[in-house]
Regions:
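Short, flexible helical or helix-coil boundary motifs
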Residues: 18, 37, 41, 68, ...
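Amphipathic alpha-helical segments within well-ordered protein domains
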Residues: 15-18, 58, 62, 75-78
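Short terminal alpha-helical segments
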Residues: 1-38
C-alpha cells in the first residue's frame, strides 16, 4: 500500500532531475522541502492520513540501519555517507526498500 502517494510522486520528479530541486544533492534541503510540501498538502486539504513522509522514513531508516534520526533522516544519512551525489543515491536506494514504496523492508 502506498501511504505517501503525493510525496512519492514529488520524489520521483526529484530523482529524475535533482538539480532542479536542490543544490549539490543537499539532502537537508530536500528534507526541508518535504516538510514544506506536506504543509502545503495539509493547507490545501489533500494530505492523506498517513502522508507524513519524513516521520515514516525516519522510522524506517532507524529500524533498518540503526542510524539515529534525532536530527532528521537527512542528517542520519549524511553522518554516514557525507554530503555528495553518493549520499543522494543512498537515499534513493533506501527509498526503494520502504514498504510504503512497495519494496520489501
Amino acid at each position: 500500500m502506498n501511504t505517501h502517494p503525493l510525496t512519492l510522486e514529488y520524489l520521483k520528479k526529484v530523482a529524475m532531475r535533482p538539480g532542479m530541486f536542490m543544490r549539490d544533492f543537499d539532502l537537508r534541503a530536500l528534507e526541508l522541502q518535504l516538510y514544506g510540501f506536506e504543509a502545503g498538502l495539509s493547507a490545501a486539504g489533500v494530505m492523506g492520513d498517513f502522508e507524513n513522509f519524513n516521520r515514516s522514513f525516519s522510522d524506517f531508516l532507524l529500524s533498518t540501519t540503526e542510524l539515529s534520526c534525532s536530527q532528521g533522516w537527512a542528517t542520519a544519512i549524511l553522518s554516514k555517507h557525507g554530503q555528495s551525489e553518493h549520499s543522494f543515491g543512498v537515499f534513493l536506494s533506501l527509498l526503494e526498500r520502504t514498504t510504503f514504496q512497495g519494496g520489501n523492508s
